Amino acid sequence: MEITKDTIKHVATLSRLAFNEEELDKFTDQMGSIINMADQLSEVDTEGVEETVQVVDRDTVFREDIPEHWQGQTRETLMENVPEKANGYIKVPVIINKDEDE
């Protein structure tokens, strides 16, 4: 599969990203290298090699989702490290603007 500058532009548009010409050239080369590596892997003879789903011989272990209290830490001391706060909450930048979707 050949990766062209148009392919990168298309994916960038779908991702709502904007790249200049230098970045397009760089990403086209990088993605081309990645795809070439994947193509090389598909040429490896795996005849007789048993399929592997998980390389570690153990089941997935989940812990209970229980909040842990950090010794000596309070909500106030943790909030001291927050760059922006509003009404006692952490203030983060807007990611999705509902006005843009309408």
Swiss-Prot record:
Coiled-coil stretches: none
Top-level EC class: ligase
Gene3D superfamilies: Glu-tRNAGln amidotransferase C subunit, N-terminal domain
Superkingdom classification of source: Bacteria
Gene Ontology terms for molecular function: asparaginyl-tRNA synthase (glutamine-hydrolyzing) activity; ATP binding; glutaminyl-tRNA synthase (glutamine-hydrolyzing) activity
Any one of the GO BP annotations: glutaminyl-tRNAGln biosynthesis via transamidation
Quaternary structure annotation from Swiss-Prot or TrEMBL: Heterotrimer of A, B and C subunits.
NCBIfam families: gatC
Similarity comment text for this entry: Belongs to the GatC family.
PANTHER family named among the record's database cross-references: GLUTAMYL-TRNA(GLN) AMIDOTRANSFERASE SUBUNIT C, MITOCHONDRIAL (PTHR15004:SF0)
Biological role: Allows the formation of correctly charged Asn-tRNA(Asn) or Gln-tRNA(Gln) through the transamidation of misacylated Asp-tRNA(Asn) or Glu-tRNA(Gln) in organisms which lack either or both of asparaginyl-tRNA or glutaminyl-tRNA synthetases. The reaction takes place in the presence of glutamine and ATP through an activated phospho-Asp-tRNA(Asn) or phospho-Glu-tRNA(Gln).
HAMAP family assigned to the protein according to its UniProt record, in alphabetical order: GatC (MF_00122)
Name assigned to this protein: Aspartyl/glutamyl-tRNA(Asn/Gln) amidotransferase subunit C
